[in-house]
């Protein structure tokens, strides 16, 4: 008799398997990332029905198998159906789901990661369906917020408050329109521009690997202030007043940082790019 176990899980990925089955990648708080078969879920009258769709949270009864475990029963707790009703929301949700699949552990409890992902998916889902500048700014801001928190839980979030070279705290200077600070992906965060010589000295003391350390981009005061919001549990209401382009730059910076430190190219990020291009005429003609 097959051994049974219970788990709560959110569907992150689904692949067709055989004639009517589906192979699901699921994040559970109890067992981390698991891959299980949802038998017959692609049949029109399947007893599992929509429980095998993406971003559905189920209470599961699973039977152990030789190679793959199988879902015996599934009861839906909640689902983020609103994500599929808007291309931007769907792209953002898939982006976070793909990132989670790279950082989640298998056969280990992932309670904090499970709740964190659900929290950010819910925020994105609850955004009102619009295509104006304000809505798009909030979408990218919420996505960047989720990315940062996932990196933080993995212990690899970029340093956004202290200079990576000196450890000194950096504050954006809004009174100087030319004020900038550097961001180094391999050094791990922000660097005061006039501290580049310190960076080189700092790197030589560590290893030859760090000799290639460089400032990848310069960011202005507003962009730094946005980065410095990301560690907070909630974004400030300033998100309604900030530049759409600044949030796009923050997301792209986090994307490059994430891909570098995980050694993985985030495929779902292309969906975000496609979406932003599709609405760019509306964004360019809109005002907040």
Swiss-Prot record:
Keywords of this entry: DNA damage, DNA recombination, DNA repair
Annotated Gene Ontology cellular component terms: bacterial nucleoid
Organism: Trichodesmium erythraeum (strain IMS101)
Domain of life: Bacteria
Function: Involved in DNA repair and RecF pathway recombination.
The protein's name: DNA repair protein RecO
Gene3D superfamilies from the UniProt entry: Nucleic acid-binding proteins (2.40.50.140), Recombination protein O, C-terminal domain (1.20.1440.120)
GO biological process, one term: double-strand break repair
Entry's family note: Belongs to the RecO family.
InterPro entries referenced in this protein's UniProt entry, alphabetically: ARFGAP/RecO, DNA_rep/recomb_RecO_N, NA-bd_OB-fold, RecO, RecO_C
